[in-house]
């Protein structure tokens, strides 16, 4: 079952919590309620079925071992739908294989018990990532970017080079250059550098001018 409190979701960050330990899930819900709107689930299936109040998760907090899979199952399920969600695994013990795989996937790792300080530090570290993601989504809608063009924009903002992007998408660099050209035509920018600089100004503005 999904335990969701959405009395006033507008304007609040949305957090996905997945933990089959009901008591600890309640603790996480209380800790996260200070910062935004937590949705608590207890298995992979319910986690992937849960819908964030505003259409996208700000972050996910995942127990590693779950009744129908594990934290990687949730993370990869979200990615398969095109949802890039900053994620932290919260576990009672560290396993080398889990830590290494989490690192490869860009996931953070925390060991129980955790408190408000750990939550605050994690949310501060992903603030920039969340701002970038929001600007990319805004531009996708505003300029009618395709999935490939959106990937080019996101890669530029994240500092991913074109060779790596082409390899990760399984396309040639010639095809990638075509996506870049079409993206620039839609954006009205003379170069990728100009587009990235303009997008970064929006990212900074969304973070309060830092």
PLM regions and their residue ranges:
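Basic, Lys/Arg-enriched C-terminal extension of HTH/homeodomain DNA-binding domains
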Residues: 181-210
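Residues within the DNA-recognition helix of helix-turn-helix
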Residues: 122, 179-182
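Hydrophobic "lid"/C-terminal helical patch
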Residues: 123-126, 156, 199
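N-terminal regulatory/sensing modules of transcriptional regulators
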Residues: 1-134, 208
């Amino acid at each position: 079952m999904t335990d969701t409190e959405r009395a006033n979701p507008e304007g609040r960050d949305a957090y996905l919590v997945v933990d089959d330990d009901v008591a600890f899930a309640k603790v996480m819900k209380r800790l996260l309620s200070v910062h935004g709107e937590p949705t608590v689930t207890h298995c992979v299936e319910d986690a992937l079925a849960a819908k964030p109040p505003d259409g996208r998760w700000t972050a996910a907090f995942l127990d590693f071992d779950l009744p129908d899979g594990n934290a990687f199952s949730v993370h990869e399920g979200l990615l398969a739908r095109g949802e890039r969600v900053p994620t932290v695994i919260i576990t009672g013990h560290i396993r080398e294989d889990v830590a290494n795989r989490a690192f490869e996937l860009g996931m953070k790792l925390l060991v129980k018990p955790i408190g408000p300080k750990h939550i605050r530090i994690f949310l501060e570290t992903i603030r920039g990532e969340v701002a970038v993601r929001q600007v990319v989504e805004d531009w996708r809608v505003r300029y009618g970017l395709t999935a490939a063009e959106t990937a080019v924009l996101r890669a530029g903002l994240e500092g991913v080079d074109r060779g790596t992007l082409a390899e990760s998408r399984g396309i040639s660099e010639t095809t990638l250059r075509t996506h870049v050209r079409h993206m620039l035509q839609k954006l009205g920018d003379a170069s990728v550098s100009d587009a990235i600089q303009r997008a970064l100004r929006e990212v900074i503005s969304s973070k309060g001018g830092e």
